[in-house]
């Protein structure tokens, strides 16, 4: 914790390195994409984080990185593939079943959101990036006094790992980002899945 204090030499990063922090600009992915030279260069560099083994699922700075692919049309499948692989590899039902320190529930929360098929990848922005849920049906109890409804239902149709279609209350929804308000007002979100 005292590294870099009193002008001591420091690597410039805490609990990570340049790979872990390069894409940590959740509030301005569009600006970062432009800075990197466009969509293809951004996606290629992001994919290299995973291909080279530089993704660190044990710490917060880059835990949202798998979800960034869904910001680019046609690349959403990468998010869906990575989330399934990361859940299987790093989260088990054993005493040490989470990667690293849970840091006040951060890693457990990442796993729960990911299993539900949605993740709030930008702190302070009330929206979620969508991915394939783990379970066939999830029912989230809501207090109707605050939400106007008593539940949010998340359904997965089919046995595939990839999303073919997303529906809100039975109507086609063509995006992989959803606002908190739209999600709660919908009452039901259905992920129709397929094999790649």
Regions found by a protein language model. Give the residues of each.
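Beta-strand-rich recognition domains
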Residues: 142, 152-158
